[in-house]
Amino acid sequence: MTRPVRLQDLRDYKKNNRPWAMLTTYDYSTTRAFVDAGIEVFLVGDSAANTMLGYSGTNQVSFEEMVMLTAAVVRGAGPAMVVADLPFGTYEASDEQAVRSATEMVRRTGAHVVKLEGGVRMASRIRAITDAGVPVCAHLGFTPQSMNQLSGFKVQRGAEKLTADVDAVVEAGAEMVVFEMVPADLAAELTARCPIPVIGIGAGNATDAQVLVWHDIANLPKGDHRARFVKTYAEVGSQLTCAARFYRKDVEARRFPAEEHTF
């Protein structure tokens, strides 16, 4: 798509049963590569805490770090849509805090949508942000920022609770919603009745879209544990290690720089 991707495009994709792919990305150069691959929607996730910054959990990434990463992605995204996570601690306290964080994220980065975790309990935050003119993506099911309350990584099976959460975020004005680690049959049922696009991660293949962390599809770093819902499409970790090793050996043997690399 040469013109900017719009929220109406995603609604049309849902109406026409056209699935679409979202990827996380955190920097300019990687984003450019994914634009060339035809990815139309990017998520600058708080997963950057682990994948890019080396923190032990997503709750450790700061607002300023997310602003820096998101701005870089927007500069590389071209016509693609960019969704930015609001990190833990930047929206939970009050509607006013949520609006400040969301508007600041959009103003400073150019992101098109902000994402936050929670359903019924965050409905007023979603409504306040939406009323302030910022589109919202909700995140339901397994919510990593609340992992301590959820007792770790577990599939979220509560149909009644998830249904109530979906209804709440839709009523609050969310433009899209992520289902994480939700049983496939439940995700399919809720996707069919949900009027906004549903993005799945570990939620079966009946959702309107799929999202994965790009490091997972590329097996980077090599050997890291991958969740069951991940499919590896390339061995980028191994390729990077090989490239760096060959470079090091060439330097040590004075094979690089060769004559063709010298002025």
Swiss-Prot record:
Pfam families: Pantoate_transf (PF02548). 3-methyl-2-oxobutanoate binds at residues 46-47, 85, 115. GO terms for biological process: pantothenate biosynthetic process. GO terms for cellular component: cytoplasm. Binds 1 Mg(2+) ion per subunit. InterPro entries: Pantoate_hydroxy_MeTrfase, Pyrv/PenolPyrv_kinase-like_dom, Pyrv_kinase-like_dom_sf. The keyword Cytoplasm applies. Transmembrane segments: none annotated. Mg(2+) binds at residues 46, 85, 117. Pathway: Cofactor biosynthesis; (R)-pantothenate biosynthesis; (R)-pantoate from 3-methyl-2-oxobutanoate: step 1/2. The active site is at residue 180. Its EC number is 2.1.2.11. Keywords: Cytoplasm, Magnesium, Metal-binding, Pantothenate biosynthesis, Transferase. It is an enzyme of class 2 (transferase). The keyword Chaperone does not apply. Its cofactor is Mg(2+). GO terms for molecular function: 3-methyl-2-oxobutanoate hydroxymethyltransferase activity; magnesium ion binding. It is found in: Cytoplasm. It catalyses: 3-methyl-2-oxobutanoate + (6R)-5,10-methylene-5,6,7,8-tetrahydrofolate + H2O = 2-dehydropantoate + (6S)-5,6,7,8-tetrahydrofolate. Catalyzes the reversible reaction in which hydroxymethyl group from 5,10-methylenetetrahydrofolate is transferred onto alpha-ketoisovalerate to form ketopantoate. Belongs to the PanB family. NCBIfam families: panB, PRK00311.1. Homodecamer; pentamer of dimers. This is 3-methyl-2-oxobutanoate hydroxymethyltransferase.
